[in-house]
A protein has these predicted regions:
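Phospho-regulated, low-complexity intrinsically disordered regions of nuclear gene-regulatory
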Residues: 2-26, 50, 56-135
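A short acidic, leucine-rich amphipathic alpha-helix
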Residues: 40-41
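Short capping segments at the starts of secondary-structure elements
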Residues: 30-36, 49-50
Length: 135
């Protein structure tokens, strides 16, 4: 049974909370060709303020004494979305064998928000490079 609340998709027995279309729509509106989850969040929370509020209530922000925060959730969703054949992102390379191919060190400001010294960097596919949607 599906439960819908303010545009946030919640499925019983499933981990889908935000619809994939919302993920794709927000990635298209990120003004950079390469971006972090923090850049994505800046766009997502402006486009979907109620969804953002619900996600923060569910997962919390960094510093709220939770291991799995809203930034972790959305970063994981971007990772999974990047591997879909229709994704507008290049497939994200996960950390392996002490290699941080698609990661970079966080700035001091980013670390205060994100918590980790490393942050994933997502890249738009070349054919979508200049195709920024307008919402």
């Amino acid at each position: 049974m599906d439960i819908r609340q303010a545009g946030v998709e919640v499925k019983m027995g499933s981990k889908t909370i935000v619809e994939e279309e919302e993920i794709e729509e927000a990635t298209k509106n990120v003004p950079k060709d390469t971006f972090t989850v923090l850049d994505f969040i800046d766009v997502f929370k402006d486009m979907h303020p109620e969804d953002w509020k619900n996600l923060v209530e569910r997962f919390g922000l960094f510093g709220s004494k939770r291991r799995y925060t809203v930034t972790t959730y959305l970063s994981n969703r971007l990772d999974v979305y990047s591997h879909k054949p229709y994704s507008t992102l290049t497939p994200f390379t996960r950390y392996k064998e002490a290699k941080f191919k698609d990661y970079r060190r966080t700035t001091k400001e980013e670390k205060k928000i994100f918590g980790s010294p490393w942050i994933a960097v997502f890249k738009k596919k070349l054919e979508n490079k200049n195709a920024h949607a307008v919402y």
